[in-house]
Amino acid sequence: MCGIVGIVGKSDVAQRLFDGLKRLEYRGYDSAGICTIEGGKLERRRAEGKLDNLARELSAHPLSGTTGIAHTRWATHGAPTVGNAHPHIVGPVALVHNGIIENFKPLRDELIAEGRKFESETDTEVVGHLVAREIERGASPEDAVAAVLPRLIGAFAIAILFREHPDLIIGARMGAPLTVGYGDGENYLGSDALAVAPWTQRIAYLDEGDWAVIRRDAIEIFDRDNRPAQREIVESGASSAPVEKGNYAHYMQKEIFEQPIVVAQTLQSYVRPFEGEIALPVAEADLESVDRLTIVACGTSYYAGLVAKYWVEQFARVPVDIDVASEFRYREPVLEPGGLALFISQSGETADTLAALRHARAQKQRIAVVVNVPTSSMAREADLLLPTHAGPEIGVASTKAFSCQLAVLAALAANLARAKGRLTPDEERAIVEHLREAPAAINAALNHDEEIAAMAHLVAPARDVLYLGRGPDYPMALEGALKLKEISYIHAEGYAAGEMKHGPIALIDEAVPVIVLAPSGPLFEKTVSNMQEVRARGGKIVLISDAKGIAEAGEGCMATIEMPQVHPLIAPLVYAVPVQLLAYHVAVLKGTDVDQPRNLAKSVTVE
């Protein structure tokens, strides 16, 4: 959510800044802007809505200048309007900001009492006034920033231009990511390595409280105590090529269809097929001492964690606690020193999850993370890094990253079971074979795309939709409901099938489609009983099952979607596909913005 790009360059930077924003578009935004220093003036262009609107503004009113900053904004304080869009200009400074300044109200009151005028509703403008005030009092840019940063409470990343210093940008971070990039005769900063990848692969990640002075020929980094600091310069590995949709209508559609490939790529790091072994990509995981596992995540990653709870307890017989990251710290969880805490995040920058990780670290927990960005903040703070290999995921609604998380978590559960002596070599070989079958099974599920597209019109008119499942299919019901509400804006809820009679059944009538995830197996008959309860009250059922399940219970359903018969271990990876495709095709029918649904952000970097 929100994105920052900055360049201190050798030639005009406006187009490159815009290109950098395009690379950050996946993070989610509702307005955008660019500011450069041109002829001794701060020149700015801003637009509400998509980057296409900013492109039109730049075409009508071009910008020149070799130093500039750019920003995509996801509104927190103040509506998504041009007036609230970044960059903000306050006298001699212009700035962009990701995050939230929690104490902006008393700071704003202080500044208003001095007679300062505000032009926006944002918390960001407060920072601009504070820095401008220091500059107007005679401070250098460095001294002004050093004086202001200690006054800010919250999580933020900031980039500042100074009108009288046309070859300078100062960036700072606390709780939100910021990266500096080292070029040839010019330097950069960005919210992540992807933003600067076309210009440099040599980057450094700022630590908590760091601020950086970026000039054309040098970058100086200071810590929170204003002492010079050295941060390791690394090769980012971020692709400099733009991520294209190819022949697909949307990034989400493309990413759904990439799942067989990326799950196979991910499993290559965790499975030794010839040895019939699960192997984590670390030299020594020391899992035999784990007596309890704590899992923390948000959104789709949380549902992946719920599936993992079933697997870990079934295979390793290790008890699992799982929490939504935004609640974890505030309930003061009981954590025994030396326990293992597992954090799941696509971006590795999710603010709530990162804060929970640091809380667990303070409680002397060992930290394991499952992330799709191995250079992210969470990855850098982990004791045990478990990367997925989904590649860049542009669609805000997660699909392929979720499936890769499931693949990693299945491998972790099996590895933990072996470490605890709960898995025989033959059982481990069987798990390896089942995991190796997953990509082909996912591909078989994708073959039902046209069928699912044809039945989407049965769901699209609904105002409410229910999803039901038992066992590991219950988290998949939750995930299916989340996908539908995220991109189609239809109210949807997921429930454990056995909970229907405890309240949700009151919602059932002929206008409420009920999506049932029910592979044949030990829990199938129980789920069929719940389907009968729905049918008796006029509910319209869409049954997602295998051929055996559909033969037994498909009669009388509004529609059925046949999945391949698979082992229960990989069923969640397979059954993710139909709920993703159903949500996608319903959203297309309704004409929503599939890749960037309203009010949502890909990388949620505020609490």
Locations of the language-model features?
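Generic C-terminus detector
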Residues: 540, 553, 566-607
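Extended hydrophobic-aromatic, low-complexity segments
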Residues: 181, 304-306, 321-322, 351-354, ...
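Glycine-rich, anion-gripping cofactor-binding loops and their flanking helix/strand elements
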Residues: 179-204, 326-361, 499-533, 566-580, ...
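Active-site phosphate/pyrophosphate-binding segments
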Residues: 259-263, 267-294, 363, 384-513, ...
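Conserved short alpha-helical segments that host acidic/polar catalytic motifs at enzyme active sites
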Residues: 1-245, 249-250, 258-291, 330, ...
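Glycine-rich phosphate-binding loops that contact phosphosugars or nucleotide phosphates
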Residues: 288-437, 517-522, 526-559, 582
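Glycine-rich oxoanion-binding loops at beta->alpha junctions
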Residues: 66-83, 270-285, 308-344, 350, ...
